[in-house]
Structures are given as structure tokens and as C-alpha cells.
């Protein structure tokens, strides 16, 4: 018995929901760390503000379209999760970051979404509403999928995949596959097309990870700390280590006669100080007895 397109769309929608559910929960370790340390530790709220906007946009689209329940379920969940993330970040962030977060939320999530809602609901005719909103969602989704280009460029430039978590790339690629088939089976190119690009970039990221992966290397750039700052600290440590090693191993390094005489004088002086301290200690003990 042939399976209908509607049933297949539901199956891929459920699979997409399950995978996207875990992707939404991926930042939990970050916020557990923020909660335990009572500090945002240099993390930024921008990704979560953008994710909140995306969830609002796709929820609105699914409600207008009326036959995309799977989009409503996952984006409703994402909406709640992103609000929790932003709230936790705001609570533990310094004053400057709090102000910046409020500005982003007002500009992107309130004014941005508000403008789209007014345009599509009150200005655009009902017959064109879904089409126009679909184009807006598609353009936004494409811009989000293009975002990893910065990471890809960084991996190629540094020839290191330490900035690119393979697991997240894999699940995002898998999610793109599920939502592509969901959109294709619903004959909705606004859902399907952006996920083609998402799949391509996801596969590219995994290939680059396998090419530039360094076995045993788990060095990651902590949020809020630049590699330049780390390298400066490393240089200082190397200098300090060099000074210690030189002082301990000077007798192994060839020296000219002047240096040797100076070294002997210093050593004799140190020995004399030790003997003097020893004699003073003995005199102190005798006088005490």
C-alpha cells in the first residue's frame, strides 16, 4: 500500500521536530555554567535574540499557512527556550551587556517582527499574505544558513577545526535534510529551499572538520577571550620558564673565562652566606642550651 505524501510529510516533520528539539537544547551546558558562576563570562546574547526572532517568524508563517502544524510545535518550543536563555543571560550579565541585550530585543524581536506583522497582516492583501511572508522567511533563513561562512573561512585560514564542533554540524545537517523533505512533500519551497543551502554548508563543515581535525587536540577559544590575549600570556610564561631553566643549567652552557670567574665568585659568595647562617644557628642553639 502506497504511503500518501501527507503521511510522509508528517513523518519527516516529526523527525525534524525531534532533531531540532535537541539542537535547541544544545546551549544548556553554557547556561548551566553561567548559572553556577553567576556571570555571563563574555558570552553574547545576539544568537539567542536572532533565534527568538526566527521562531516568532516561522510560527507566524505556519499559523497563516494553516497546514504546517509541525512548524508550530517546534517553533513554539524554541520560542519558550530562547526566552529562558535570554532571561538567564540578562540576569547574570553586566550592566553594559544588559543594555545591549534590551536594545537588540527591542530592535529585532519587537520592532522588526512588529513591522513584518503590520506589513503582511494589514497592508498586504490576504491572497498574497502567505506568499510575501514566505519570501521573508526564506530570505531570513538563507541569511542564517550563510552565517557559518565566517567559521568556514576561519577553519581554512587557520587550518584547524577546533572552532567547529562536529556534533552540532552533523545534527544541523540532519535537521536540514528532514525539513527539506517536509517542505518538498508539502510543496512549500519557502521551507525546502533554505534547507538545501543548510545541507550544503553542513556537509562542507563536516568535510573541513575531517580534513583539518588534529587528533587529541581539544583546545577551544573561550568566549570573551581572544587568541591574541592567550598568546601574549603564553609568551610571558615561556620567558619565565626560560629564565628559570637558564639559572638552573648555567654550568652546562659554555662560558668564557670572565663569565666563569664571575660565576665562581657568585657561587663562593652563596656558599659563604650558607656557612655564615649555619654558624649563627649553631651559636644560637649553644647559647640557648
Swiss-Prot record:
One GO CC term, this protein: plasma membrane
Stretches assigned to the Extracellular side: 1-5, 65-70, 125-131, 187-190
Positions in the Cytoplasmic compartment: 27-43, 92-103, 153-165, 212-289
Subunit structure and binding partners: Forms heterooligomers with SWEET8.
Family as reported in the entry's similarity comment: Belongs to the SWEET sugar transporter family.
A single BP term in Gene Ontology: sucrose transport
Function text: Mediates both low-affinity uptake and efflux of sugar across the plasma membrane.
A molecular-function term among this protein's GO annotations: sucrose transmembrane transporter activity
Keywords of the record: Cell membrane, Membrane, Repeat, Sugar transport, Transmembrane, Transmembrane helix, Transport
Domain MtN3/slv residues, every copy: 11-96, 131-214
Induction notes from the record: Induced by the pathogenic bacteria P.syringae pv. tomato.
Gene3D superfamilies in the cross-refs: 1.20.1280.290
Major localization class: membrane
Gene: SWEET10
Protein name: Bidirectional sugar transporter SWEET10
PANTHER family: BIDIRECTIONAL SUGAR TRANSPORTER SWEET10, RAG1-ACTIVATING PROTEIN 1
Topology relative to the membrane: Multi-pass membrane protein
